[in-house]
Amino acid sequence: MNLHQTVEHEAAAAFAAAGIAGSPVVLQPTKNAEHGDFQINGVMGAAKKAKQNPRELAQKVADALAGNAVIESAEVAGPGFINLRLRHEFLAQNIHAALNDARFGVAKTAQPQTVVIDYSSPNLAKEMHVGHLRSSIIGDSISRVLEFTGNTVIRQNHVGDWGTQFGMLVAYLVEQQKDNAAFELADLEQFYRAAKVRFDEDPAFADTAREYVVKLQGGDETVLALWKQFVDISLSHAQAVYDTLGLKLRPEDVAGESKYNDDLQPVADDLVQKGLAVEDDGAKVVFLDEFKNKEGEPAAFIVQKQGGGFLYASTDLACLRYRIGRLKAGRLLYVVDHRQALHFEQLFTTSRKAGYLPENAKAEFIGFGTMMGKDGKPFKTRSGDTVKLVDLLTEAVERATALVKEKNPELGADEAAKIGKTVGIGAVKYADLSKNRTSDYVFDWDAMLSFEGNTAPYLQYAYTRVQSVFRKAGEWDATAPTVLTEPLEKQLAAELLKFENVLQSVADTAYPHYLAAYLYQAATLFSRFYEACPILKAEGASRNSRLQLAKLTGNTLKQGLDLLGIDVLDVM
């Protein structure tokens, strides 16, 4: 159930009874549970508009809520707030229903969409580094939530598998007579660095590299065979990283830049035909009045270079048109570094004008900040090099395993390694996903691996605590009526019933940290409930009801963490 929506509906009816129908209710959870479960903040705005005394109007609304099947009490506070306390019978009935529902009371959206989500998308011919982490895990979590809430999700890994860097690589390998050799990703990286130096310093080599790009685009069999070898090696590495991270990305989700190669010229020509793109110094350019350059003139969105070459803009236009036209997307999400915001704003504006992005479809830039080191600079190795993602994840598992062994010296090596991997990978992912994605954040091993505070280990431990209860509980009845009498029982129940609203917020806004904050709040409340309301020592209906609350808490934590892409453990 959507608890927020249910309470808001009751409040709206009370607003109508008080003569202010249609005014925004402005419903929020109370900051202090002693004041109730929710607070209505919309009366003051309605009173100002209606030229009434806000406290008197608030009292009318509160009186209209009296005897309500959902609201136990409505008390006016301050200049016109209304604090609401929910009926324990209402909470108990819905906890019982959620516990006995395969989806834990979370309904699917009434308006499902086909959503194409573009995330991870590394450039190939080099190893993935920490800069690829955020897009990969943020996109994966958003895609999971969208699926769980009833949408059709199409994942797209728009890898950089085309362009000048591949011409450089081919030119270098031919020059070094290594074009028939077998090689690995580490070799490719070494070759690429050497090729880049040659490209920057030797005009003749640069011309040769560009010639190989033309051959690649023209379908030259020898060049294509080398290119495919580069791509296969790179994608194999990327998939191994995705598997370690537990992402849902699969090889069939790869739709790289090369996929749209044949569509680039038709798109450029179409924009000219529609009068959007014009010739400017030999290039095809869309001038956008919505964006100004430093001189205050319309910004240039170049779709084809002088000489006929194409850019990211060309590929992204063709790609967007494909996703709307062929994949039938109603919503497009691009999970990309926030520094690319202007490019995507221009892409969406151009696509809208060209008719590629119809009015009934929505394109969203899901930007994110930078992972920083403790020195406040982008996260690097001590020598200043980019941190390879494989190395980061390996260190996470090693650190977590050492921590697990320290806390549980009796564990066998295999069990400690299994727990260490789950805790380590979960810690890295949660440290990122628990932050507002638009912000930069500091990468801190000690903080993320702590078993206290808003961390994955804390939430994973909360889940194991629930499992421990049921290993000792013996018989209990999930179908028996739920009875709530203690304040913390009611608080925990109300929190668990907010799950649907939180997931819908994440689906609507693409902010996974809302879910992380909710899970931390639920786990913290369960800890307080566990201490204040003995579960196994209680008797009769009280014992059974507390077990029901514990079970639903465990279910919610497990499902919620899974939607963040984080595994749980029965024992830690």
Curated annotation (Swiss-Prot):
Top-rank taxon: Bacteria
Biological process, per Gene Ontology: arginyl-tRNA aminoacylation
InterPro entries found in the cross-reference section: aa-tRNA-synth_I_CS (IPR001412), Arg-tRNA-ligase (IPR001278), Arg-tRNA-synth_N (IPR005148), Arg-tRNA-synth_N_sf (IPR036695), ArgRS_core (IPR035684), DALR_anticod-bd (IPR008909), Rossmann-like_a/b/a_fold (IPR014729), tRNAsynth_Ia_anticodon-bd (IPR009080)
Reaction it catalyzes: tRNA(Arg) + L-arginine + ATP = L-arginyl-tRNA(Arg) + AMP + diphosphate
SMART domains in the cross-refs: Arg_tRNA_synt_N (SM01016), DALR_1 (SM00836)
Cell compartments where the protein resides: Cytoplasm
Keywords: Aminoacyl-tRNA synthetase, ATP-binding, Cytoplasm, Ligase, Nucleotide-binding, Protein biosynthesis
Gene Ontology CC annotation, any one: cytoplasm
Matching Pfam families: Arg_tRNA_synt_N, DALR_1, tRNA-synt_1d
Stored PROSITE patterns: AA_TRNA_LIGASE_I
Chain span(s) of sequence motif 'HIGH' region: 122-132
Subunit composition and interactions: Monomer.
Family statement: Belongs to the class-I aminoacyl-tRNA synthetase family.
PANTHER family: ARGININE--TRNA LIGASE, CYTOPLASMIC, ARGINYL-TRNA SYNTHETASE
Entry protein name: Arginine--tRNA ligase
Native species: Neisseria gonorrhoeae (strain NCCP11945)
